[in-house]
């Protein structure tokens, strides 16, 4: 890591390391926002701003990819919490016309079954199989213990086995 490549407020992060994982970070952000590209771009940009300003500080306790995925995950959760609050407030004032977000383009039986899983099971399956994280790293991204992550992972595999064997 060259000195000129290091972020001023995050000495363990380099621009080149962020560039190397950008595609994976963007893919993870897309999955956090129902594949809305503009929202995913905002999430990634906000994550990078937090890294640049030092608001999110990487200490090297995990891989950079795991850390940045965690930042994106937490930003998405915060965004949807705020959005849910606004919707609840709007519902008190008037009956809003709320439509469900569109689903990703892949309609295979497997991904339909994955989308039907509970949120944490769905997240761990995506992190492990699509984002190439270990169960331990995925657990850190999700903010749960490794044991809890393993339980969600095992339950997800059993549920998928059951759903796919009936189709």
Show which residues each predicted segment covers.
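DNA-recognition helix of helix-turn-helix
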Residues: 73, 136, 142-167
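A short, charge-rich alpha-helical start-of-domain segment used by transcription regulators
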Residues: 3-27, 38-41, 52
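Structural recognition of an alpha-helix C-terminal capping motif at a helix-to-coil junction
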Residues: 42-49, 62-74
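A short pre-motif secondary-structure segment
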Residues: 124-128
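Arg/Lys-rich amphipathic alpha helix in sigma70-family domain 2
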Residues: 53, 57-59, 70-91, 103
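Internal acidic/polar
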Residues: 78, 86-114, 134
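Alpha-helical residues within the helix-turn-helix
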Residues: 31, 140
